[in-house]
């Protein structure tokens, strides 16, 4: 058989095999077109489960007369015009295939009128070449699509239709999903002349729970926990049922939407399931209605014929974001705020990237710790609030720390009598707390230094380790902690959990905050030196180390962490070496006076100089 171009009707019928699975598929495509047209009211009439009639009328913007024929053509759409549009789709439809595919397997008529037109027009396609006929009609502003005798010309497809009741149940489920996505649209559904569903539009700021209860039932509404979670371009809102009271009937309620598009996505379901796993049995499923808003450039919806699936460009970030959002509202059910004596509760801190969710936002502010924390007092001049348990989460943290170091370095020396040798002492003292001048980098991780005419070699990785230990060792106040954007959740044994609970006070002084449940521990904050580390490796090793200890001293733990940190630089530059030495000289002056083994090695150049002179 020679290669040939398929007739338009046959090509459309092949496409319909992917798009039009059953009457519910037709309803989905046509209602989504109505929503894209800006409709605020949609009336859906079904007869015999959709096998005989599917009629959908809306009050959207309508279609112009000269565009009606194009509307029934393949790959004709008003929703995208370029590749840039395809990479950031905001409409529900975009391929321009639905009407052509549906008209090829049914008797379809399209009647529409725009606000600018005085009369409406009706179009329908027929024949082998799908020629479109347009004629005048009576119709208000908006569009009506009527699909008669679905699959009349494809008997093989028609015989696979289920009973009238089953097919209508599928249509009813599609309308339920769409009604949950668009609270601002009135949707009426009738079957065989009887109104079955009436979903009235909810005004902006109105009670969405009323429609939620009408669709999902009062049992779900009674157990629903509201979620409001945001980070950057990601927003998660909706409801999740309390897993402790989830029944098999409730578990059937699993509705998820991405940018308003109903979705069945494995990644999203896995994140929700993982957040609920400690509270659900092995054979139980979570119940939820969740809405994910994401930058359209960060999600690809053109990966499934029926658009049931999407692909996220940063799938791990999306997974962990959803997981943490759901987990936060579930943990709120178990947590109660600790009493803070008789002190008034400080006002909530403004957080640019996150806003408080239902419960508490662990991306920005972890729960209060049990160990006694030092009391902070507000700065008298700045007018700022008292320091939070996470002082480094405030924008001015680095600047404040630098100011403290500067004040320490500029502390005036005791007054001395004006004796002759005294003026040289400050210079000598300053010189004694310096490793010297960095000449170059040798073998990528050693610095060649010059001081008072002497040459020495310094191991930068060892100096970095001593600096990290100094930064991690608590002084008069605990080490400042920084909350993790995505908290780290790890499974632990009973022995490891017991060790963590015993070491909680010491870890809190080191800036490590965690929360544990039956079989897991969630690391919510770490000190600054650990932010750039691979915590997936470091934290399990730290837990293993703690499980072998009987005494938990912050200094010993800090030393262990410092020895097990990976260097931030595989190959050092001059600028990085100079910065490191400046920090070491400031925080660890004792290393300059008495360098430990493995840090500094003097280099004797006299034999080399003598050899050169002897030549």
Curated annotation (Swiss-Prot):
CC annotations in GO: mismatch repair complex
PROSITE patterns for this protein: DNA_MISMATCH_REPAIR_1 (PS00058)
Residues that span the membrane, as ranges: none
Gene Ontology process terms (BP): mismatch repair
CDD domains membership: HATPase_MutL-MLH-PMS-like, MutL_Trans_MutL
Record Pfam families: DNA_mis_repair, HATPase_c_3, MutL_C
Region (Disordered): 363-397
Similarity section: Belongs to the DNA mismatch repair MutL/HexB family.
Protein name as catalogued: DNA mismatch repair protein MutL
Originating species: Escherichia coli (strain ATCC 8739 / DSM 1576 / NBRC 3972 / NCIMB 8545 / WDCM 00012 / Crooks)
């Amino acid at each position: 058989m020679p290669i040939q171009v398929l007739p338009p009707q046959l090509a459309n019928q092949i496409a319909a095999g992917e798009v039009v699975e059953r009457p519910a598929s037709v309803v989905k495509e046509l209602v989504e077109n109505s929503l894209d047209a800006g409709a605020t009211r949609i009336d859906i009439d079904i007869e015999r489960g959709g096998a005989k009639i599917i009629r959908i009328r809306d009050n959207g913007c309508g279609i112009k007369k000269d565009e009606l024929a194009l509307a029934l053509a393949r790959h004709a759409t008003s929703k995208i015009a370029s590749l840039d549009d395809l990479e950031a789709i905001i409409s529900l439809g975009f391929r321009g295939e639905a009407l052509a595919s549906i008209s090829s397997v049914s008797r379809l008529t399209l009647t529409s009128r725009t606000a600018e037109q005085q009369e409406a027009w009706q179009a329908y396609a027929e024949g082998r070449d799908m020629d479109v006929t347009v004629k005048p009609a009576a119709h208000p502003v908006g569009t009506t699509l009527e699909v008669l005798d679905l699959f009349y010309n494809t008997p093989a497809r028609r015989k696979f239709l289920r009973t009238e009741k089953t097919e209508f149940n599928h249509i009813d489920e599609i309308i339920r999903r769409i009604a949950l996505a668009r609270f601002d649209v009135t949707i009426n559904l009738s079957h065989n002349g009887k109104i079955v569903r009436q979903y009235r539009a909810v005004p902006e700021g109105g009670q969405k729970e009323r429609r939620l209860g009408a669709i999902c039932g009062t049992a779900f509404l009674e157990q629903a926990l509201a979620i409001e979670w945001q980070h950057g371009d990601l927003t998660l809102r909706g409801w999740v049922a309390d897993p402790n009271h989830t029944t098999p009937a409730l578990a059937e309620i699993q509705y998820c939407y991405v940018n308003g598009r109903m979705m069945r996505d494995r990644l999203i379901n896995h994140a929700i399931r993982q957040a609920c796993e400690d509270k659900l049995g092995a054979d139980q499923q979570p119940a939820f209605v969740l809405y994910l808003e994401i930058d359209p450039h960060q999600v690809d919806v053109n990966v499934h014929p029926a658009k049931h699936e999407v692909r996220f460009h940063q799938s791990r970030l999306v997974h962990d974001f959803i997981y943490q959002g759901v987990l936060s509202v579930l943990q709120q059910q178990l947590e109660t705020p600790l009493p803070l004596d008789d002190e008034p509760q400080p006002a909530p801190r403004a957080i640019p990237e996150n806003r408080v969710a239902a419960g508490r936002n662990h991306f920005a502010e972890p729960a209060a710790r049990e160990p006694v924390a030092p009391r902070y007092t507000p700065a008298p001049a700045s007018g700022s609030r008292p320091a939070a348990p996470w002082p480094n989460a405030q924008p001015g943290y680095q600047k404040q720390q630098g100011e403290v170091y500067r004040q320490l370095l500029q502390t005036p020396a005791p007054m001395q009598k004006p004796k002759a040798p005294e003026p040289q002492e400050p210079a000598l003292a300053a010189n004694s707390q310096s490793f010297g001048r960095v000449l170059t980098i040798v073998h990528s991780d050693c610095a060649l230094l010059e001081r008072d005419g002497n040459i020495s070699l310094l191991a930068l990785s060892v100096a970095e380790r001593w600096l990290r230990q100094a930064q991690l060792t608590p002084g008069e106040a605990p080490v400042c902690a920084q909350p993790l954007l995505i908290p780290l959740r790890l499974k632990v044994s009973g022995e490891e959990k017991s060790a963590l609970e015993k070491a909680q006070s010491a870890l809190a002084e080191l800036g490590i905050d965690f929360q544990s449940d039956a079989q897991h521990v969630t690391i919510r904050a770490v000190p600054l030196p650990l932010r750039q580390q691979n915590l997936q490796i470091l934290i399990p090793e730290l837990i293993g180390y703690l499980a072998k200890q009987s005494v938990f001293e912050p200094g010993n733990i800090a030393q262990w962490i410092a020895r097990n940190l990976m260097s931030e630089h595989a190959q050092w530059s001059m600028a990085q070496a100079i910065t490191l030495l400046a920090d070491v000289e400031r925080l660890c002056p004792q290393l300059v006076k008495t360098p430990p083994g493995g840090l500094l090695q003097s280099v004797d150049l006299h034999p080399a100089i003598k050899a050169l002179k002897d030549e």
